[in-house]
Amino acid sequence: GYAAKNVSASTTTTTDNGQNKPSVGTGIYLIKSSAETVEMNPSYISSKKTDRTAQFLVSGLIDADIRVILNENKATLETSNLPKFQFVFDTLKNNNENQWFGKNSTPKNFFLVKLKTTKKTRELIIGTTSALQDQIEIKEKQKIPLKNKKIGPGVYEVSPISPLEPGEYGIVFSNAIWDTNSGKIYDFSLKK
């Protein structure tokens, strides 16, 4: 699998009300300080696996977790325990090709989740499978509550409601397609 992990600084402009606004396109930006905003480039899912051990050992009626895997056990981008993000959506171009950041999208279409680390990778449980069906959904208990404030047309400041523990995190789209061709997670690390 391929992990896109380039972090590039973006330029910012100041709006009339003193808020920083990226002068670049749609996406998610980490606000490092009042003077520095960094574009977050997603990591792409390298594989997907299902742990069917319990199903085989005990019963086919037991659900098995479906996980997506990111290469490397740590994100390139590091931040503090109460990170602030800027979400920029396309409000002008009527961009319907980009379901993530199109004109009908809002921060409520995204979830913040903690990723499980292994020696070589990071994982996210995206659902369960049973003998009868697959159920793809990120459970409520996995989602970290976010607050958001609109600061301009299609521009929102987003942050966790409570400080985060050290570890690996990701921002995911609620209707993501979890495959190795297009599945992506906007990942970051909190220092220990």
What residue ranges belong to the model's regions?
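Periplasmic N-terminal soluble interaction domains immediately after the signal peptide in Gram-negative
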Residues: G1-A4, Y169
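Primarily secretory-pathway and cell-envelope proteins
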Residues: A3-S130, S174-K192
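Extended, solvent-exposed segments with strong compositional bias
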Residues: L124-P153
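Aromatic- and Gly/Pro-enriched, solvent-exposed loop/edge beta-strand patches characteristic
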Residues: P153-E157, A176
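A glycine-anchored, Pro-Gly-centered beta-turn/N-cap motif
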Residues: G154, P163-E168, V172
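A structural micro-motif recognizing beta-strand termini
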Residues: S159-I161
